[in-house]
Amino acid sequence: NSAHPCCDPVTCKPKRGEHCISGPCCRNCKFLSPGTICKKARGDDMNDYCTGISSDCPRNPWKD
């Protein structure tokens, strides 16, 4: 999406100096800090946390 403020309209990748375009661990073109909750626990589930190096929300490795 060339109209996105984080996206370089030519490459469709994050603009220079920006980390990401979208995702649960991306806000204002930057990765969220490590340890930021990106998916809250439900039932017996545990919270999932941002890594600080990706816009994805990784699954908690301690889940069964």
UniProtKB/Swiss-Prot annotation:
Disulfide bonds join C6-C29, C20-C26, C25-C50, C38-C57. GO terms for cellular component: extracellular region. It comes from the Eukaryota. Pfam families: Disintegrin (PF00200). A motif (Cell attachment site) lies at residues 42-44. InterPro entries: Disintegrin_CS (IPR018358), Disintegrin_dom (IPR001762), Disintegrin_dom_sf (IPR036436). Expressed by the venom gland. Heterodimer with subunit alpha; disulfide-linked. Inhibits ADP-induced human platelet aggregation. Antagonist of alpha-IIb/beta-3 (ITGA2B/ITGB3). This is Disintegrin CV-11-beta. It comes from Cerastes vipera.
